[in-house]
């Protein structure tokens, strides 16, 4: 019997919506990364984009455990000599684009090649409770119910 290899044409992508209110960022990101890759499916094929389209709402209400909100630092470089810049997770969460915390957490759990970039295109993160993807009829995924450690009150 030959090993099954999924073809891109025969994959049916589902739409999933996740409410990030009170969820721990790292635990949420692992679940999102797994579903984006399609590893929860029996037809998972490593070289094919077979995961779901995921919509995350209330990204600004996601939480860190411990003192990570103050101690976790995001670095970027301007390209100029000595141009390394840093921002704490607290600064990013309270800033203009708090959804970037979840985007970065998921992005760093995926491969950094062409397929990883394509898979990241299937993730949509919004800071508020509304999103423009109601026409796709996304199914709600209750991450808090999967494990009691996924949520902080």
Swiss-Prot record:
Role according to the record: This protein is one of the early assembly proteins of the 50S ribosomal subunit, although it is not seen to bind rRNA by itself. It is important during the early stages of 50S assembly.
Record-level Gene Ontology MF annotations: mRNA binding; structural constituent of ribosome
PANTHER family reported in the protein's UniProt record: LARGE RIBOSOMAL SUBUNIT PROTEIN UL13M, RIBOSOMAL PROTEIN L13
The keyword Ribonucleoprotein is assigned to this record: yes
UniProt similarity note: Belongs to the universal ribosomal protein uL13 family.
Pfam families attached to this UniProt entry: Ribosomal_L13 (PF00572)
Entry annotated with the keyword Ribosomal protein: yes
Domain of life: Bacteria
GO biological process: negative regulation of translation; translation
SUPFAM superfamilies: Ribosomal protein L13 (SSF52161)
Record's protein name: Large ribosomal subunit protein uL13
């Amino acid at each position: 019997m030959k090993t099954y290899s999924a073809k891109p044409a025969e994959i049916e992508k589902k739409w999933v919506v996740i409410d990030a209110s009170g969820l721990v960022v790292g635990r949420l990101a692992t679940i999102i990364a797994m579903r984006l890759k399609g590893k929860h499916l029996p037809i998972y094929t490593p070289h094919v984009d077979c995961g779901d389209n995921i919509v995350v709402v209330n990204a600004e209400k996601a939480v860190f455990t411990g003192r990570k909100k103050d101690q976790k630092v995001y670095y970027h470089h301007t390209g100029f000599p000595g141009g390394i810049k840093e921002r704490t997770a607290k600064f990013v969460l309270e800033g203009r684009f708090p959804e970037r915390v979840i985007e970065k957490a998921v992005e760093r759990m995926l491969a950094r090649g062409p397929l990883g970039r394509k898979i990241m295109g299937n993730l949509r993160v919004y800071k508020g409770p509304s999103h423009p993807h109601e026409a796709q009829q996304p199914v709600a995924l209750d991450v808090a119910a999967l494990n009691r450690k996924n949520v902080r009150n």
